[in-house]
């Protein structure tokens, strides 16, 4: 639901009062009447949360789960219709943490706390939207649900998440550089994502703007990595003047592109660029074999290279066999 209904539409309001779970129903007749309201959910079955006193009847498009929490706190549910609620981003993070890997849960956290969303269908790509939540709000939600299923994994994944990612590849790069060595990461100090730099008068004159936003940043060291994605960097001259302005301010900015992130050799080169100036949270050496494995898992979790053919056709279609126009 969170991927199918962009927040820009304003269709899902947050429920501002607690929900007594005893008020929920698993009546199949009632569920059938609500199915039109679930049309935005592209995948089936739809998962329904009810109290332990509700029957777990069978419906081919619905899977019913029972919760032993008597009350769901205010602010964790969204209103789809008068009689239908869906889990908000914080509760979704908790629930999915119990169903997926630690890497998968953390990548979901980056997405929920970032300004992008994957599509509801299992294809690569993403769309822009405002952040659905933040680390502060997820932390508050987890504190309200002690003992909930998946809470341990959710807290582990939460520690890895950063606010502010604008794309899956920013998430991949941040994860590879900041995740601990036990997960295969480089264990660099966590960067700030899309950090705001206020320019002085001279730098403003060069850049033509009074502030800049840097993709991955370590402010104390004035070091930054910029992901050179085609969607953001279409004005080469403006980018050059922006980087000249940042250099005037004492910043060192390294630019990387998709090829630098999607395979281990160029990523290792990026690591060498910053390893002498960015603090690490581990004394263990960076293991490039483990980093390669983590990179593969991060790319898979962000659907890298997962084409649209599986969503568009009912049979496997060899890449390049058909010209598709979207």
Indicate where each model-derived feature is located.
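Short gly/ser-rich loop at a beta-strand->alpha-helix junction or flexible surface loop bordering the NTP-binding
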Residues: 1-150, 181, 286, 293-326
